[in-house]
Amino acid sequence: MNQGNQAFENARKPFRRANLITALGLGAFAFATFAYSVYRVHEDTFEDVVMTPELEKKIAEDRDLSKKN
């Protein structure tokens, strides 16, 4: 069984570096996309969102409740 395991490891050896580089590249891309999204949302002021009086009242009530807790 040990000989089969050694053959398996030898067969995988040439692909380890390429697989690692690919995995790191995909991970870096995913992290960069997430970081960029957070950055863009953080700088948005949401001034273009229309607030109805009912919604403003509900938000004020929720803020008061969260301050009490």
From Swiss-Prot:
Annotated GO biological process: mitochondrial cytochrome c oxidase assembly
Mitochondrial intermembrane side: 43-69
Regions crossing the membrane: 20-42
Subcellular location: Mitochondrion inner membrane
Subcellular location, principal: mitochondrion
Protein's membrane topology: Single-pass membrane protein
Induction: Differentially expressed during meiosis.
Mitochondrial matrix side: 1-19
GO cellular component, one term: mitochondrial inner membrane
Keywords attached to this entry: Membrane, Mitochondrion, Mitochondrion inner membrane, Transmembrane, Transmembrane helix
InterPro entries reported in the protein's UniProt record: Coa3 (IPR041752), Coa3_cc (IPR018628)
A Pfam family the protein falls into: Coa3_cc
Role summary: Required for assembly of cytochrome c oxidase (complex IV).
Family to which the UniProt record says this protein belongs: Belongs to the COA3 family.
Subunit structure: Component of 250-400 kDa complexes called cytochrome oxidase assembly intermediates or COA complexes.
PANTHER family registered for this protein in UniProt: CYTOCHROME C OXIDASE ASSEMBLY FACTOR 3 HOMOLOG, MITOCHONDRIAL, CYTOCHROME C OXIDASE ASSEMBLY FACTOR 3, MITOCHONDRIAL
Stated name of the protein: Cytochrome c oxidase assembly factor 3, mitochondrial
Organism: Schizosaccharomyces pombe (strain 972 / ATCC 24843) (Fission yeast)
Source species taxonomy: Eukaryota, Fungi, Dikarya, Ascomycota, Taphrinomycotina
